[in-house]
Amino acid sequence: MGELVKTIAKALVDNPDAVEVNEIHGHQSIIIELKVAPEDMGKVIGKQGRIAQAIRTLVKAAALKEKKRVIVEII
């Protein structure tokens, strides 16, 4: 799922080399930390957080197959 977030984020930003994704696995959940360059933060979040919410929705749909809870944090 980290690769999914990374692919989406790289398509959105101007500086794709600065995109970093960290996965922290818990017992029933996965936390995905997405780090982008400060100047690209607005592009990943979007107006009123719509793009960030869309990314979270896609990742949650992918997580249903694994029966895990996924949290996407944009840092």
Curated annotation (Swiss-Prot):
Q: Which SUPFAM superfamilies match?
A: Prokaryotic type KH domain (KH-domain type II)
Recorded GO molecular functions are: RNA binding
Tell me which stretches of the chain form a coiled coil. none
Output the superkingdom of the source species. Answer: Bacteria
Task: Please report a single Pfam family linked to this protein.
Answer: KH_KhpA-B
One GO BP annotation here? cell wall organization
Its chief place of residence is: cytoplasm
Q: Subunit structure, per the record? A: Forms a complex with KhpB.
Q: What is the protein name for this chain?
A: RNA-binding protein KhpA
